[in-house]
């Protein structure tokens, strides 16, 4: 199904890209049933890759939600047959609003196709469903074509990983792209600090009080000299050293 679409990444595809790039508003995706589910995914992918977009349910649209559409928007309507009643019902209002229309259909000669500014033919020769009824190959083709649109727009917008991170701060992707040392470091009153002359017992009290498991050791000028961790103290105690009574740092050698 996807291979059938390769020759159709053509002048119509380019026209759709130009229409969206010239759009002063947002990309509105609409579709009913399985096409609507594909439309939701398309809207999410576009929005997360630099093209402001949202999904509009066509049945809700004719009951007031068309108010979300403006004359500066581009509407992408999905329908395999191109004759889905709920989608066709919103076309007159879209024209009155002044939004541009891209039809993503399996039949370019359909009513939806004839009313569109740009027609994207995503038709397939047959469905994977053995009954030839359930949308399978057709939805896969529409999804792939939608991803192609999103990625072409991403490149045209020179969209970067840093921009992607702003829109996707959650999950492992967000942590990978946004998490910095500054995000998790402790500073100011949150950072436990002791002088090099501090006894280990006193340092241990500071470690316990701050709950970080370590203290920064500085000199009289506040310049970092090293780090003392609770692990360092445990290892020192395991060697039988009287660290609690040590008035100053000492080198500890093995027996």
Name each region found by the language model.
Residues 128-132, 233-243:
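A short, polar/charged loop-to-alpha-helix boundary motif
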Residues 163-186, 191:
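Long, charged amphipathic helices and adjacent flexible linkers at domain junctions
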Residues 193-211, 237, 250:
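The conserved cystathionine-beta-synthase
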Residues 179-185, 197-200, 242-246:
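Short, structural beta-strand-to-alpha-helix junction motif
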Residues 25-144, 150-153:
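Glycine-rich phosphate-binding loops that contact phosphosugars or nucleotide phosphates
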Residues 184, 207-210, 215-233, 246, ...:
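A glycine-centered beta-loop-beta connector
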Residues 241-255:
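Single conserved hydrophobic/aromatic residue that forms the stacking wall/gate
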Residues 1-22:
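An N-terminal, well-structured beta->alpha segment
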């Amino acid at each position: 199904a996807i291979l059938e679409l390769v020759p159709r990444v053509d002048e119509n595809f380019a026209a759709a890209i130009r229409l969206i790039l010239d759009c002063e508003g947002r990309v509105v995706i609409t579709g009913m049933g399985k096409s609507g589910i594909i439309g939701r995914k398309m809207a999410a992918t576009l929005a997360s890759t630099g093209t402001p977009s949202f999904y509009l349910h066509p049945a809700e649209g004719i009951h007031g939600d068309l108010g979300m559409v403006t004359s500066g928007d581009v509407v992408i309507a999905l329908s395999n047959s191109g004759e889905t009643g709920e989608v066709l019902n919103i076309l007159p209002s879209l024209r009155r609003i002044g939004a541009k229309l891209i039809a993503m259909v399996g039949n370019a000669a359909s009513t939806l196709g004839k009313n569109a500014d740009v027609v994207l033919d995503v038709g397939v020769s047959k469905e994977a469903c053995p009954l030839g009824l359930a949308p399978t190959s057709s939805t896969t083709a529409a999804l792939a074509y939608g991803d192609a649109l999103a990625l072409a727009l991403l490149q045209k917008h020179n969209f970067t990983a840093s921009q992607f991170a702003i829109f996707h701060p959650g999950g492992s992707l967000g942590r990978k792209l946004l998490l910095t040392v500054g995000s998790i470091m402790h500073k100011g009153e949150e950072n436990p600090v002791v002088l090099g002359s501090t006894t280990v017992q006193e340092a241990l009290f500071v470690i316990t009080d701050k709950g970080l498991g370590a203290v920064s050791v500085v000199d009289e000028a506040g310049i970092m000299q090293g780090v003392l961790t609770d692990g360092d103290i445990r290892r020192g105690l395991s060697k039988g050293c009287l660290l609690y009574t040590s008035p100053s740092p000492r080198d500890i050698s093995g027996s």
